[in-house]
């Protein structure tokens, strides 16, 4: 642990997913004893629960959360009187721990999360009582594939693939999102990033959506709309039945398949009130039973699996030397998905495997990161960072951008997207005043997903933070400059501007987006 975290005694990692969520925790005195929570409302055993809240009619109070909120009928008599789960769990295990002082929270986020979205998550963590203040240093973020990579790094031992320089691909296939990253094993059990992290929304829940679309074709779009609107819990119960009976056991081998009989009269009798007369007559002939055949289920999978395979291919095209591929996340347990991935890439990657309990790989990896943040040595930037400069206007520059004194505001690049940076690496540049009588210099930091930018107001360029320094030595005229330095830390950027004339330094920090 770093010196700034000397008070930390317990690390708690939270994998807050779009479909399922979980948490794990450990005491720094016993880092090998990782505990993954498996006790949830209405469930005992699963390492995650559904990311669902059910509110009362006024949308003020949470009545149910987790699995009961998703697939059970609402009851006005049922109240959610349980204590906040994470706090109560840690308080019970270590009564002497002061939560706000001694607990470090590691929160996982999807790879595509922007600074704005991370800020929203931080604000939610504050409102949920996980941190004492919005500026607390006891909350850190890590991307889901990076956390999974840390967990899978240990899995390399099983294949004797622990040589320094070994590259491996992490494919985190969750319920909602799929995130990928290629990492390189460095000395001292550290990790470096080789390619930009990529991701898309094509996780396991999209197979569920294909099932709902299939059902809509059978009972009518209008009936499905009414079912979603007024009986969402019943619909989700049907989805769970589909998952249990058809989705989870599906291997892609027709010999293993048994026709799934969806009995609407038993599972969803309310549909009788929603279907039109023509559909009702047809379903009555079928005795309200819809047969779901092999080709039906395969079609539900294939559109989603195809998108995942394209994401994997994109990562492997960017890194020709990849020794292993690890599949993690809840949907990675799909036998059909694993089969398709192995068939597609077995000639390119010699090791295609999953670690123990792949559904918990992200949350356990996040916990390992919290216990030793130095495990991540380098990352690849997904943003270009720069400041607004004011050089002389040149022939060919837009006339409408010329200032009255013959200058032009430009985006001055400090470091470009796609570059690999070590944690705590410094990037510096010398910047000069634009006017002889200038009293201060604006060092506002801008970011863009583009590799290059000309102006700070062009589409895609966003202001990350404001930063101004004083330049009192006006007698030096234009012969004044500052050394502007960005230090890329674990979770934030530290900006330093040093006046070269008087040696005075100015500092500020910005939240870092390596995602």
Give the positions of each predicted feature.
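Phosphate-binding loop and its immediate beta->loop->alpha context
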Residues: 29-127, 207-256, 272, 427-428, ...
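A short acidic Gly-Thr/Ser loop motif
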Residues: 14-20, 145, 163-179, 183-186, ...
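Conserved phosphate-binding/catalytic loops in two-lobed NTP-binding clefts
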Residues: 130-147, 339-365
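Acidic low-complexity intrinsically disordered segments
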Residues: 187, 266-307, 314, 374-515
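Gly/charged contiguous loops adjacent to phosphate- or pyrophosphate-bearing nucleotide/cofactor binding elements
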Residues: 110-112, 146, 199-342, 390-398, ...
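Conserved phosphate-binding catalytic cores of ATP/NTP-utilizing and phosphoryl-transfer enzymes
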Residues: 1-9, 136-171, 190, 360-377
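Early-domain small/polar-rich strand-loop-helix modules and first-structured segments
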Residues: 1-84, 140, 190-191, 197-199, ...
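Conserved helicase motor "Helicase C" RecA-like lobe of SF1/SF2 P-loop NTPases
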Residues: 119-124, 332-348
């Amino acid at each position: 642990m770093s010196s700034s975290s000397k008070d930390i005694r317990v690390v708690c990692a939270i994998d807050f997913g779009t479909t399922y969520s979980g948490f794990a925790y450990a005491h720094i005195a016993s880092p090998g004893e990782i505990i993954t929570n498996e006790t949830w409302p209405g469930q005992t055993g699963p390492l995650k629960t559904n990311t669902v809240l059910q509110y009362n009619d006024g949308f003020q109070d949470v009545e149910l959360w987790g699995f009961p909120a998703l697939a059970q009928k609402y009851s006005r008599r049922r109240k959610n009187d349980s204590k906040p789960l994470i706090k109560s769990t840690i308080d019970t295990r270590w009564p002497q721990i002061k939560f706000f002082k001694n607990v470090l929270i590691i929160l996982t986020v999807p790879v595509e999360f922007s600074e704005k979205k991370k800020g929203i998550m931080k604000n939610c963590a504050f409102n949920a009582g996980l941190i004492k203040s919005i500026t607390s240093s006891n909350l850190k973020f890590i991307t889901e594939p990076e956390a999974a990579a840390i967990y899978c790094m240990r899995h390399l031992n099983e294949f004797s693939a622990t040589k320094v320089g070994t590259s491996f691909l992490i494919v985190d296939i969750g319920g909602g999102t799929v995130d990928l990253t290629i990492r390189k094993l460095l000395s001292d059990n550290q990790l470096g990033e080789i390619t930009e992290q990529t991701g898309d929304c094509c996780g396991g829940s999209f197979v569920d959506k294909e099932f709902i679309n299939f059902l809509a074709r059978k009972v009518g779009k209008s009936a499905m709309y009414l079912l979603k609107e007024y009986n969402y819990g019943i619909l989700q119960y049907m989805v769970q039945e589909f998952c249990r009976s058809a989705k989870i056991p599906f291997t892609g081998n027709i010999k293993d398949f048994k026709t799934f009989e969806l009995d609407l009269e038993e599972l969803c009798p309310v549909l009788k009130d929603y279907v039109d007369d023509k559909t009702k007559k047809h379903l009555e002939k079928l005795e309200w039973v819809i047969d779901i055949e092999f080709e039906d289920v395969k079609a539900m999978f294939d559109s989603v699996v195809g998108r995942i395979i394209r994401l994997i291919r994109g990562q492997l095209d960017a890194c020709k030397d990849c020794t292993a591929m690890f599949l993690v996340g809840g949907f990675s347990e799909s036998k059909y998905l694993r089969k398709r991935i192995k068939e597609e890439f077995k000639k390119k990657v010699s090791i295609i495997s999953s670690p123990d309990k792949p559904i918990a790989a992200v949350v356990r990896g996040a916990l390992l990161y919290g216990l030793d943040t130095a495990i991540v040595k380098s990352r690849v930037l997904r943003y270009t960072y720069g400041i607004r400069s004011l050089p002389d206007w040149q022939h060919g520059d837009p006339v409408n951008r010329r200032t009255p004194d013959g200058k032009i505001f430009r985006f001055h690049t400090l470091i470009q997207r796609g570059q690999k940076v070590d944690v705590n690496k410094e990037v510096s540049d010398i910047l000069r005043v634009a006017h002889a009588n200038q009293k201060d210099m604006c060092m506002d930091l801008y970011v863009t997903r583009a590799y290059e930018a000309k102006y700070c107001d062009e589409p895609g360029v966003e202001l990350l933070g404001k930063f101004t320094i004083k330049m009192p030595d006006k007698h030096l005229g234009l012969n004044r400059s500052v050394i502007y330095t960005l230090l890329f830390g674990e979770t934030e950027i530290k900006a330093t501007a040093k006046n070269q004339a008087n040696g005075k330094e100015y500092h500020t920090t910005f939240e870092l987006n390596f995602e």
